[in-house]
């Protein structure tokens, strides 16, 4: 009798545990509810992803349109179809460093309205990236009106920097103009890669300095040799030899006063040469 209450208590504890472990009706219901909830969340996430993709697809055309509008606004103006331009380099397409380069730009108005040519500019740019400026030359203001079916010619000149010699650069020459309606145009008259030639003719500063140094060195050598010869000549004195006159008749006495000459003659009278006696030969007549 004492064991019966204990068995009942044990059954009461073990039965619920076995029901929970085996997944009784309540457990299966909970699992079913969980599965249905998971399926609903998956379907909701799929629907949300599809909505996001649809929104992205709808936004892409608008973004492309905005990008195109920004490019149109920020892009440089183009040339007008009613105008033609030509270019002619005066000395050919040679670009010597530190020397003037001249060219002529011709503008032809083929339209029915006037064009106002505003300016002409040129620049050297990096060959791999034309957005990077190497040397930007001064823009030439023109402000010239070109009527329809008329032509105009403009001259421009620039000097490439001396350190740029022997290297390639992108040369860009732009002609800026507009019509009477205010539409701005820009024509890239020349847009190519050129090579700046090192200047060979003429004398640069280094060459002139070298020649001046050589001339000064040569002058110092000449002066040193001259001084050396003079010092040697001074060490050897010249022996003076007194040269007398062969006779008194060769002496000019006109510059001596007459009184002095008289005194000299009295003090040392001249001696006449003695006549030598002639020897008579034997048998000569007396």
Curated annotation (Swiss-Prot):
Chain positions with Phosphoserine modification: 247, 268
User: Which residues are tagged as glycosylated in the record?
Assistant: 136, 191
Name where it mostly resides: endoplasmic reticulum
UniProt entry keywords in alphabetical sequence: Calcium, Endoplasmic reticulum, Glycoprotein, Membrane, Phosphoprotein, Signal, Transmembrane, Transmembrane helix
Compositional bias, Basic residues, is annotated for 268-279
Membrane topology per the entry is: Single-pass type I membrane protein
Q: Does the keyword Isomerase apply?
A: no
The annotated region (Disordered) lies at 28-83, 264-286
Q: PTM per UniProt?
A: Phosphorylated in its cytoplasmic tail.
Q: Name one GO cellular component term.
A: endoplasmic reticulum membrane
| Record topology, Lumenal segments | 22-207
The subcellular localization recorded is:
Endoplasmic reticulum membrane
Domain of life according to the entry: Eukaryota
Q: Where is the signal peptide?
A: 1-21
Q: Where are the transmembrane segments?
A: 208-228
* Positions with biased composition (Acidic residues): 34-75
The yes or no answer to whether the keyword Transport is present is no
Spell out which residues lie on the membrane's Cytoplasmic side.
229-286
State the similarity comment: Belongs to the TRAP-alpha family.
UniProt remark on domains? Shows a remarkable charge distribution with the N-terminus being highly negatively charged, and the cytoplasmic C-terminus positively charged.
* Note from the entry: Seems to bind calcium.
Q: How does it assemble?
A: Heterotetramer of TRAP-alpha, TRAP-beta, TRAP-delta and TRAP-gamma. Interacts with palmitoylated calnexin (CALX), the interaction is required for efficient folding of glycosylated proteins.
Question: In UniProt terms, what function does this protein have?
Answer: TRAP proteins are part of a complex whose function is to bind calcium to the ER membrane and thereby regulate the retention of ER resident proteins. May be involved in the recycling of the translocation apparatus after completion of the translocation process or may function as a membrane-bound chaperone facilitating folding of translocated proteins.
Q: Which PANTHER family match?
A: TRANSLOCON-ASSOCIATED PROTEIN SUBUNIT ALPHA, TRANSLOCON-ASSOCIATED PROTEIN, ALPHA SUBUNIT
Its recorded name reads Translocon-associated protein subunit alpha
């Amino acid at each position: 009798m004492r064991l019966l209450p204990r068995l009942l208590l044990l059954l009461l504890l073990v039965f619920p545990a076995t029901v929970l472990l085996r997944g009784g009706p309540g457990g299966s219901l909970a699992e079913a509810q969980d599965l249905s909830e998971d399926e609903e969340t998956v379907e909701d996430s799929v629907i949300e992803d599809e909505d996001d993709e649809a929104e992205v697809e709808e936004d892409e055309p608008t973004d492309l349109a905005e990008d195109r509008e920004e490019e149109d606004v920020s892009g440089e103006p183009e040339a007008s179809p009613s105008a033609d331009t030509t270019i002619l380099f005066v000395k050919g397409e040679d670009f010597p460093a530190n020397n003037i380069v001249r060219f002529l730009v011709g503008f032809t108005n083929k339209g029915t309205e006037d064009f106002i040519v505003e300016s002409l500019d040129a620049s050297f740019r990096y060959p791999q990236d034309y957005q990077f400026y190497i040397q930007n030359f001064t823009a030439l203001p023109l402000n010239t009106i070109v009527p329809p079916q008329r032509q105009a010619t403009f001259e421009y000149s620039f000097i490439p920097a001396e350190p740029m010699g022997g290297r390639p650069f992108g040369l860009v020459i732009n002609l800026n103009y507009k019509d009477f309606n205010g539409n701005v145009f820009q024509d890239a008259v020349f847009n190519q890669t050129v090579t700046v030639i090192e200047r060979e003719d003429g004398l640069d500063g280094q060459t002139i300095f070298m020649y001046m140094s050589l001339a000064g060195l040569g002058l110092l050598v000449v002066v040193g040799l001259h001084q050396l010869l003079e010092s040697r000549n001074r060490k050897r004195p010249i022996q003076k030899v007194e040269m007398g006159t062969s006779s008194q008749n060769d002496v000019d006495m006109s510059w001596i006063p007459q009184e002095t000459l008289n005194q000299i003659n009295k003090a040392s009278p001249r001696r006449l040469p003695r006549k030598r006696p002639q020897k008579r030969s034997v048998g000569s007549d007396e």
